[in-house]
Amino acid sequence: MIYCVLSTTPGTFWFPSGFDPKPYHPSADSKLLPLGLITLSACSTRVSATTRWSSFHATDPSLSWLTGSSPWLVILQGQGGSLFCHDVLQGRLYILSHSVSLFLKTGLRHCEAIYRAPLWRDRPLPSLWTCRDPDKAFLPTLLARSARRGLAAFYALWRLHLGSRSELSHPVLEWESTELVLTDWRRGRNEAQRDAPSVAEHFARCRPLLDELCGEGGWLPFAFLSTSPHVWLILTEGGPVLAVDVNDTSVWRIADDLELLRRLGSLLLLSGLRLPLRPPSGSGEAAGEPGYEEEERRGRASTASATAATSTRGPTRPTRVTRKGRVATGGVHLSARPESEEQTDGHHGRQESSDDHQRGGSGRGHRDDGAHRHANDKTEPQQRGEHEERKQTDSGRHEHAQESQVARRDEEETEQGDSERSCGGATQTYGGRGRHDSCPSIPLSVPGPDPRLWVPPPHLLFPSPLPPMTPVDDEPSVRPRCPPGPAEEPPTCRPRPPRPSSDTPLSAVSRPSAPPVPPPSTARVRFFLSSSSSSPSYSPAPLSPPSPVSPSSPRSPFIPPIRSPGLRAKPRVSSGHPAAFPPAPSSAPARSERVTSVPSSASPSASCVGKSQPPAAHTA
């Protein structure tokens, strides 16, 4: 027997460390008033004296067996009189009853924290989910364990035991037992035809509701009640087990998972809190109701009139009436409407009188004409109502036609690249138009090209494969970013000077002009000499123009590549201006000698085809 001690004296409130009762204050948003604390004990004798809250020992008979850090269950009361129980360990709120009088009868029967207590590890509760077949007595345990791994693992085991029958017992009313049949609702005609012949056909009414509640593909109906074939048990992706009544489309939770369902049995299945929810608008059930089309038509008309009233554009006046009776307003053809209802009624009356005049004499025609006029007077309110609804529908259709036409023109102007439009001038319609096509279009700004965005020239996207040298700055982040100048133009292929023979004197050979010597700087220069491969290593600078992008690379040229934090960024120097150094101080006269560069390709003419020839290095 389980006893509870309810402390309602404010002086005896003792909260464990880490527990804050402020969220339960009546001034909070939840509006839950704490009534007291519940201490659970599993002893054979009833606890009569209050326990000292200052010290707890393991041998204390009234020691709570929930957990050592938070041994309390807080009982709360809502505004409507419903009583709730907060499990501090799990952080969950359970509903106990809808009134205090009902709580005095049921007690903590519906408190699921009792059935999850760690005490049952030593003294386990009996399983209330059993199979009729003795050979499948292990099936509920295996299904509960497989559900911990998700719906895929549960489905792999569940589909092998379709058609198995089991029972759910009540924890208090032992004579109450509910039979379950494991089956698939999509194949309900085979397994459950004798019990529920129409379940497979009518279960689709709950699909929109379950998709909205659990997500598409996040639920699986695995069993139904043989005594009530319209009630199905559904396992969700997160673990909670739901019950769905396909007749009134109501949903309620019966357990947190299948492990708790084995201990609760049919407790919450028979006495749970049902939540009748209305299916989403536009579903099959709502569309089949009488008057649904009329309600939808009125809703579309009212939405169209509200959109027209709040529209920023002024009313469009008809310019002309075409031969087919349509009004042309700025390129949008709209149906012509009569100016007033009196003209419409008078027109019908004149047409009927002319028909009667053709049928018989003048006197009888006048009498019939009066009778028809009297009939028209009787049906005039009905015709006026239909005419007003037709006008509202037409106005909604006209408004949508105008919006679509304006959006189409804006998109065409945007595609043509009109320079007069600003960056956010064009608009486009957002949102699909399904069944509820009365939703107003939402104008969105179409982003244009940013003039502040620097677009690199083509020769920087595909530079020469062999840069001669790469300087490394001590502090590359301090140097400001400069726009590309004319110094970064691609080098051209220049013919190589003729090689002098051994008989030609040195004075007759034309010496190349020495490049300008830049002033000495603090930058270090690192040379990359590669004789084996034709493409040396290359690392771009973080503040230089973007790195080259190969045609096969999916990376955008405007996004800098990801570099390893261990490598140091090395800015690139244009290949058109080779770096040189001032001559070293020496007393000997300077003598120049030319070093010919070895081409990377075997063919002498292949170096000038699509590639820039690296200039020869001169040493002073």
UniProtKB/Swiss-Prot annotation:
This is Uncharacterized protein DR2. Residues 446-470, 481-500, 542-551 have a biased composition (Pro residues). Residues 336-411 have a biased composition (Basic and acidic residues). Residues 278-620 are annotated as: Disordered. Belongs to the herpesviridae US22 family. Disulfide bonds: none annotated. It comes from Human herpesvirus 6A (strain Uganda-1102). It comes from the Viruses.
